[in-house]
Amino acid sequence: MRQRTTIYNPYSSHDGIITNLNRTNFQLSSIPNHLFTIENKYTITTTTTQPNKSSLYSAIKELRIQTKFNNNESGIPIFSFHYEPGLNIYAVPQSNVDKLEFWQQVEQLIMELLGIKLSSQQWIANVNSFYYHDIQPQPLLNLKEGWKFNLHPKSNYDYIYNQDKIIIRELLTNVSEIEFNLESGIYKEIGLFLIDEKISTNDDLNLSGIRVILDEDSNTNNKEESIHKTMFHIKPRHRSFDDSTTITTTKIIPQGLHPILSTELNTTTIVIPTDFDVEECKFYYYLNLNKSLIFDQFQNIPIGSQLIINNGNKNLELPEYKINQWGNELLFEFEFDNDNDIPHHINLTVHSRYQLPQNNHSHSQISNVLNSLPNIFIGCNVKEGNLLDKSPFDTKRDVKIGGNYEIYFTEDTVFYHLQNSDNSGNSGSSTLLEINIPHGKTTFDRVNNITSLGLLIGVLMILYAISIRVFMSTTSKTKRD
């Protein structure tokens, strides 16, 4: 097994950070108020360490799980954890396999990893995989005993499975101290890097530092031979604006059964990216929509945009309890030629699906539905796009599925992310919207009793009417006789 740990030091120097370093131990302590951001990447070859796993899940070509507990921890400016908060799962079958076998194996693998049961009906199809989303993040339950590592509680992680190997990345933020030790069976490569601001730009980051190798199979007894001074450049796929001001706020405008997702943009801090490699840019709005809500693609496209993606159940008439899929995936595109074209407001009107009456004795006539915030970003084609996946931190090197909106863009696209405000008016949560949907107030027993009583009364009325007619007919015949 291989472990590659990259430590990003936001300070201007590495002086005083390394507290111990030898062939078996590496300890670091951050500068006060300049805490580390760390990516741990574990690579396990399944054909050698778990030969039975490939045959057990032979119908699965690829499976990817991306979980985000904290929306603010995306790894900017180096690491790529820019997927949607909550749980995102992607699955691809092998060619020419039985569909039932594939879904049984997917269900079994997800139960093993997450402890949740997903049926095939809960997924939707996107451009290159099946996709499942839930606002509730899920930790990996347990890892194999032979792997000798565990993920940190509630760390954002990215799990990739295919027939040859398993890759797990996790992101740790605000780390003040960390220690690494030589372990049997694990090849460890630990990198400590800072960004050299003197020669770095937003589109070309220069990383400078050292790499330390901890490997029991190493033949060297010399500490210096395990330490490698390193400097390299990366062209980041995910970028941020120079101004760190929070620039989008999304809230719900109540409108009965037709609520509006209203996003306000601080256009004074949003400009067309001017990085050296940038060519054409467009503005995008991405949203995972709960199945209790309907998007009408014929009437409710936000002003100034065009609908690019609408994956999921598009039936506008079905009630919520008839929808098996988790919801819909939406992507809108706004064209703009200059800074004045950037929209000040984006309003997306959705409609509520009919909800089952609450089967309890509550007096509430409202269902509370939680939905993810929209992801708003600027996507740009760049020159020398082939350099993007040369970065060791670019996930497209390992897998082509997943990443939510990423799969709908070409390989030469970079993303400038607009941060959501914490002051969203969303029940104290900066990552979720709360939508109130009216519904009936009763119980199923009461509905059944009233229905049965109504039918009984109807039958009695019919019988009464028939008996009256028979009686009147008999009386009339008697009088004639």
Swiss-Prot record:
Main location: endoplasmic reticulum
GO biological process, one term: GPI anchor biosynthetic process
InterPro entries listed in its UniProt record: Pbn1 (IPR042322), PIG-X/PBN1 (IPR013233)
Pathway in which the depicted protein is active: Glycolipid biosynthesis; glycosylphosphatidylinositol-anchor biosynthesis
Topology in the lipid bilayer: Single-pass type III membrane protein
Pfam families hit by this protein: PIG-X
Sequence ranges on the Cytoplasmic membrane side: 473-481
GO-annotated cellular components: endoplasmic reticulum membrane; glycosylphosphatidylinositol-mannosyltransferase I complex
Annotated glycosylation sites: 22, 52, 72, 174, 206, 266, 290, 347, 360, 449
Cellular localization per UniProt: Endoplasmic reticulum membrane
UniProt keyword list: Endoplasmic reticulum, Glycoprotein, GPI-anchor biosynthesis, Membrane, Transmembrane, Transmembrane helix
TM region(s), chain numbering: 452-472
Similarity annotation: Belongs to the PIGX family.
Functional note: Required for proper folding and/or the stability of a subset of proteins in the endoplasmic reticulum. Component of glycosylphosphatidylinositol-mannosyltransferase 1 which transfers the first of the 4 mannoses in the GPI-anchor precursors during GPI-anchor biosynthesis. Probably acts by stabilizing the mannosyltransferase GPI14.
Protein name per Swiss-Prot or TrEMBL: Protein PBN1
Gene: PBN1
